[in-house]
């Protein structure tokens, strides 16, 4: 299945990309995608966004689909999903 991830705000700054498509195995979950993203980009992010020891995003980093947060890492992804990765923290 193919999923598009759009990076926003400071996450876009650290990732260096606006968006990217991922081909994932059928049955992949939100947790699978977040782990993939963290392993790929986590080294570019500060510790308040990615915890490299636990291989987890900080709770202030959220993934959203259709305007709703993806709750629970076991939530299934679907072919064609568009996921927004954003931080609840923003400067101003």
Where do the PLM segments sit?
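Ubiquitin-like/PB1-type beta-grasp interaction modules and other compact soluble beta-rich domains
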Residues: 1-91
């Amino acid at each position: 299945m193919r999923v598009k991830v759009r990076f926003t705000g400071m996450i876009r700054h650290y990732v260096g990309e606006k968006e990217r498509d991922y081909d994932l195995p059928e049955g992949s979950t939100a947790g699978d995608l977040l782990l993939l993203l963290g392993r790929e980009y986590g080294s570019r992010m500060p510790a308040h966004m990615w915890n490299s020891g636990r291989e987890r995003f900080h709770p202030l980093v959220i993934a959203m689909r259709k305007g709703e947060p993806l709750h629970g890492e076991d939530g299934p992804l679907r072919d064609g999903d568009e996921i927004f990765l954003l931080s609840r923290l923003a400067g101003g």
